[in-house]
Amino acid sequence: TQAGEYLQYVGRTELTLRGRKVVARRNRLIPVASMTAEDPTVKAAIKKFYDESSLNEVIGRVTVRIEGKEGLGNLVTDAEAAVNGADFAFQNAGGIRIGALEPGDMTAKMVYEMDPFGNEVNVVELTPEEMRDLIRVSHRYNKRRHAVDLLVSGMTYTLYTKNGEPDRIEMAFPDGRPLEEGRYYRVALNDYIVSAYKFPHARAAKPTGKSSEETIIEYIRSRKEIAPQAPRTKLIEE
């Protein structure tokens, strides 16, 4: 089992059975840094993955350095919005697992390194107030207290906090126009956000049948060159 986050630990659970009944249980955390021995079977499986020809195929080109959660999250959300015909898209910062993409060729393997979880993209219709509720809830999950958790495409937003707690949120289209209150907009997001971020909304999310990685690869293939614009979010403590 896995425990903690960012591969800090592996969790080991030992069960003692009497017949079909568990009579004792022992749990412990094993720091990954202490695990120095290599398993040849696992090593061979990893090598097979990295040698896969389809993963090393060039799918597009990065024209500028794309760095940090914001820049990379903008790429992910741009892809999910464009491929699914959504007005907006959100991506949790914790799902971005590399630091930057350098200018040059982009391969499918680089997409899987950036976004390795295989989450399915969903589309849900939300009002501006429901999106604000989502952003407020996301901040309570947020360990990056100096920045927002949810990266976005299709809009810009500013989250104002008081004593570290989310307060008011200002949202606008990139050209500065306000969103229409009460209107339902198509919003793309991954199924982790759908299941983990408990926020009030009236309409159910619908799966697209495609993972976020498949969606990003499709988007990059169609664009050939990528250079997402940033920043789109702000966090201000009042």
PLM features: residue spans?
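Catalytic centers of hydrolytic enzymes
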Residues: A3-E238
